[in-house]
Design a protein with these regions (language model features):
Chain A
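Hydrophobic alpha-helical core bundles mediating ligand binding, dimerization, or RNAP-core interactions
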Residues: 14-17, 21, 95-105, 109
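Short beta-strand "wing" residues that participate in macromolecule-binding interfaces
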Residues: 72-73
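N-terminal helix-turn-helix DNA-binding core of bacterial DNA-binding proteins
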Residues: 12-57, 77-78, 84
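Basic, amphipathic "hinge/linker" alpha-helix immediately C-terminal to the N-terminal HTH DNA-binding motif
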Residues: 77-101
């Protein structure tokens, strides 16, 4: 067996990454944020962007993102009442992370799926 | 209600991001990859880096990462037999994504937790 360098991983890096992972976990949160990168939207418009998310799940995930201050929900006192979702500055700060996710997703697809 | 630009999210972006998300999903895969960024390691060394992962879960997640060609597993015919894990080139290609995850995790912590 070759002699290899074995350094312990930086606990600071591990913690920060786990914080981020906790926020973006699951199948729907990142797609929701990507959808709202394209502008303020109503519930049905987000659902249309994502395609295969159930209303119940979308509603739950929007709530979680709102609690974490990634998106904001605005209620308009119109007839009928209108609700719109948009990214907060914290939500917009995810843009570079999403770009890297996209880059790596493409790379992975090319390497593994081969197209 | 103001008139706002409402563009549909790019389906290509959504698909690539979902590919990437599927690979890194869960609490442990990213920490495992971070641990192995610091060098080839044995099971116990990875477990020590991460801290609170159970052996059963770690074993399951290492297997999933191996199936997706993110890590490789090498068996040494020593006494006792030794198993080592390391990142493949595809695993190493996650470095920029992990950096952004770390950056955003720090930013999020400062904004929300306030420290």
């Amino acid at each position: 067996m070759k002699n290899k360098t074995k350094n312990e991983a930086c606990p600071f890096r591990l913690r920060a990454s786990r914080d981020a992972l906790e926020i973006i976990q699951g199948k729907w949160r990142i797609p929701i944020v990507i959808s709202l990168m394209y502008g303020t939207k109503r519930f049905g418009e987000i659902q249309r962007d994502i395609g295969d998310v159930s209303p119940k799940m979308l509603s739950q995930e929007l709530k979680a993102l709102e609690e974490n201050k990634i998106i904001s929900r605005t209620l308009y006192d119109s007839m009928p009442v209108t609700v719109e979702y948009s990214l907060t500055p914290l939500g917009h700060s995810m843009e570079k992370l999403l770009d890297e996710l996209l880059n790596w997703g493409n790379h992975f697809r090319k390497e593994i799926v081969g197209k």
